[in-house]
Amino acid sequence: MRPGSVVARVPAPALFVGSGLAQYGGAALAVGLFATIPAAGVAWLRILVAAAVLLAWRRPWRLAWSRHDLVLATAFGVALGVMNVAFYIAIDHLPLGTAVAIEFVGPVTVAAVTGSGWRERSGIGLAAIGVVLLAGVTLRSDAPGATVGLVAIGVAATAWAAYIMLGRAVAVRGDGVTRLAVAMAAAALVGAPFLVARSAPVLGDWRLVAAVVGVALLSSVLPYAVEQVVLRRVGPAGFAVLLALLPATAVVVGAVALRQWPHAVELVGLALVSVAIGLTRSQRPEPVTAADAGA
């Protein structure tokens, strides 16, 4: 049986749970590197390694690329790069679960804008209340860099919204994972002038190299490839609904791997954000074939 046929049989929720465990497990591994390599440098290295893996796997030079295709893939890559760098800066200052929940304002906003009805509109209000609770607890904690973390996660949320919209446009043009490889390469090239120097410490220790490769595979290659597959099945609003499965995953990974235990008020904020995402109504999924799933 072809791998694409197997993936096509896996329900979207199951794909997202596996994707979330990998992505946030990779984030927890990345946090352990921040003492040696700045967070932005780790994020760029993650993108660089993921780009190399995807380019070797998908060999995008075999496709015919129009100027529009390249511009779209580059814009997608820039959004992806900003999202990753800002998120890593945020989790250097905020608990993983809190950062992930606040970042979900991006997908909730996409659902509200692209969907229709009271569910999508009310989701924004609930998400806003949840974010206020989470941000309030963070600011009252007097944790070093809390304000920096909140600003960074706001930037990440905005970039995530752009990623969803641009990712949909990339995916529907066909061979989404191959186009993702080009987007990753564009993100690595754009970030290189600013982040190469910050990433230099990794060159002196093979254990750091191995850790960065692990972060890239867990947090970029697997999750983003899965998301490209699922984006072929659902619209932006539906994608945002499926993402409602992930905040709890981030909290569990943060608690188990990083010993970041949320307070009661934070749990309420997390719950409100999850409900906000769940309230948004997905569009009717488009048919998916085995070839689409294996793209």
Across the structure, where does each feature detected by a protein language model lie?
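Glycine-/small-residue-enriched transmembrane alpha-helix faces in small-molecule transporters
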Residues: 1-44, 78, 82-86, 129, ...
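Alpha-helical transmembrane segments of compact multi-pass small-molecule transporters, enriched
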Residues: 48-53, 102-113, 186-190, 238, ...
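Transmembrane alpha-helices of multi-pass small-molecule transport proteins
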Residues: 36-82, 109-110, 159-166, 180-198, ...
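Hydrophobic/aromatic residues within transmembrane alpha-helices
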Residues: 33, 42, 46, 90, ...
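Hydrophobic transmembrane alpha-helices of multi-pass small-molecule transport proteins
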Residues: 54, 105, 119-138, 244, ...
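Transmembrane alpha-helical segments that form core, pore/gating elements
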Residues: 54, 110-111, 127, 133-134, ...
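Juxtamembrane helix-entry segments on the extracytoplasmic side of multipass membrane proteins
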Residues: 8-12, 36-44, 65-70, 137-159, ...
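Hydrophobic alpha-helical transmembrane segments of multi-pass membrane transport proteins
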Residues: 18-25, 29, 57, 74-89, ...
